[in-house]
Amino acid sequence: MEDLINFVINLADEELYEFLDGDSKEFFLHGGCYEFSEIIKGCIKDSRVVINNENTHCGILFERKIYDASGKVKNPQDFKVANKDDMAYMEDRFGIPEKHMVKGKTISDFMIAKIKECNIGKLIERIEGEER
C-alpha cells in the first residue's frame, strides 16, 4: 500500500503543482485527506473510508489496516468506518472548494483519471495480493 501512496503523492506533485499551495503530501495530510481517501478508494475497490473519533481526519481502511498520506496510521483504534452521515460531513468539511477544482473535476476525480492513464494494474494487483 505504501507504494501506491507514494505513487499517488508523486503523481499529484507533478499534476497538481499549479493548483496547490505547497506539496501534495502536506495538502493530503492537512485539509485534503478526504480527497486522498477518495483517490485510494478509487484505486483499491475493497478499501473503505474511515474517519477519526474527533471528526478531524480521514483515511482509508484496507485489510484491517488504516492508511493516510503518511502511510500506515499509528493509532488505528482512533478511527471508525465512515457511514453515510460521516461521508456527507467529510465531503462538506474536507471536500475541495471550487477554487481547487482541476479542469472542472474534483482533485480525486482528476487524479483517478490520471492514475488510470498510467496503467498501474500490476501495482494494484500486487497490493491486493500482498494484503490478503
Residue spans of the language-model regions?
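A structural boundary/capping signal
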Residues: 1-132
